[in-house]
Amino acid sequence: MKTEKEIHQHRKDEHLSLAYKYWREEKNQTSGLTFSDSRIIPNSLPELSTKKINFSSEVFGQNFEFPFYIEAMTGGTERADKINAQLAEIAKNQHLAMAVGSQSIALKFPELAAGFSEVRKIHSSGFLFANIGAGHSLENAKRAVDMIEANALEIHVNTAQELPMDEGDREFYWLENINEIASQLEVPVVVKEVGFGISQKTFKALAKTSVSGINIGGAGGTNFAWIERKRSKNGFNLDEFGLSTLESLLEAKMADNRKSLIATGGITSAQEIFKSLILGADLSSSAGFILKNLMQTGPEKVEEVIEQWKQDLNKLFVLTGSKNIEECRKVELLYSINMLNFIQQRK
């Protein structure tokens, strides 16, 4: 009979395998709005040079020279730790921030903390996000941060992942706990969705807390409800549930969000990063797309993709006459009829 630790580790490895399968089979489609529902209005006289572009973003007291980071994926098993080490090496080489996957397993079984700590050893001077669930205590939040000497903490809110999970939580009283952690922790706290987007109601609730940032984790990226349905026997289907990344960005605008904003959920190109910036994001991040490329082609190819994104983003800034992110925010987008309908309904 498997021990509790072995069961937890098996679940971690199942998540990895199913996330890879999800992206390999291109199941990351959403019934909601996508970035193709908006088009960038060009500036034919940009009066700019590619050498004069500065797309760095000042967030959480840190200058991110490229407004993108490697999002939380995994950790806590031999396979997962190897992937985290590869991601940390990529992040170091590309001067990117990185988030580790949920550290719950290492908080419960401290002997597994070394795999997470290795990320800091590799990316010694990089910006790292620790990661815990919203039900964890302030003490566990501090332990997670200390484990990787993190610069910030992601608290994931994952109701739509827990409910399809046979062994998942069934009680979700999180808001007060999140605020306690955010108000007492010494590093910035980011609340992160895990693939279902964030509504105006949630933005407004978080506005009253001490959290520093919100990661919208919209539909269109890895769908953890799909992953848990594959693991489960209950067949609870949430394929059509939630808000897409683009819809969540619009919700943030309509909620007059003032927290730092991170666009995650199916980010696969520089153009999607650029549109996210136009719509108010301070940073973008990606997990599943990076994982798929890492497992299919290896770390060198992932670095090539990121290098290409940097070049492409530079060109998009020039094409719109934007020297920096402040000017990028003024770029006009042409909205599709579906996008206009969404805005009208949600006003």
From Swiss-Prot:
Known catalytic reactions: isopentenyl diphosphate = dimethylallyl diphosphate
Cofactor: FMN; NADPH; Mg(2+)
GO molecular function (one): FMN binding
Magnesium recorded as keyword: yes
GO-annotated cellular components: cytoplasm
Keyword Kinase tagged: no
Binding site for Mg(2+): 162
Gene3D superfamilies in the record: Aldolase class I
Protein name (Swiss-Prot/TrEMBL): Isopentenyl-diphosphate delta-isomerase
